[in-house]
Amino acid sequence: MRGRDSEVGFQDILPGIRIKTLVHGEKTLMSKFLLRAGSELPLHSHPYEQTGYLLSGRLALRIGEDRREAAPGDSWCIPSGVAHRAEVLEDAVALEIFSPAREDYLKFLNAEDILG
C-alpha cells in the first residue's frame, strides 16, 4: 500500500486533536496528528509500541515517569503498555507509527489518499 498526504480526511478524536492514518502494512501503521495549542492527550496506555516524530510545534510529553518537552525534529519511542500523555504547548503536527498495526486506526484512512 502507498499513500500520499493531503490536507483533507482528518477526523476529530478529542477536542483540538485531529488524526489521519497515512499508510499501514501487516505489522505497522503510520498516522498524522494535527494538535491545537492547549489541547491534551490524557494519560493512557495500549499494547502497541509507538514511535513519534514532531514536525512542528511544541509538546510536553510524559512517557512513564519521564517528562520532557519536544520541539520540531524530536522523536520518541513509547514501549507497549507504558502510560503516556501529551500536552500541546503550541499548534503542532506529529507523525506516529504503531506496531503492531492498530486495527482501530484503520477507520482514519482517507480513501482519496491511497495510491495502491
Which residues fall in each region the model found?
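A short, N-terminal "cap"/entry segment at the start of jelly-roll beta-barrel domains
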Residues: 1-27, 110-116
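Conserved short histidine dyad/triad with adjacent acidic residue
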Residues: 31-45
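Glycine- and acidic-residue-biased ligand/ion/polar-headgroup-sensing regions
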Residues: 48-59, 64
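A cytosolic small-molecule/anion-sensing beta-strand core signal
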Residues: 55-56, 71-72, 90
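Structural motif
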Residues: 58-60, 67, 83, 93
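Short acidic-glycine-tyrosine-enriched beta hairpin
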Residues: 65-80
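Ligand-binding loop in jelly-roll beta-barrel domains
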Residues: 80-104
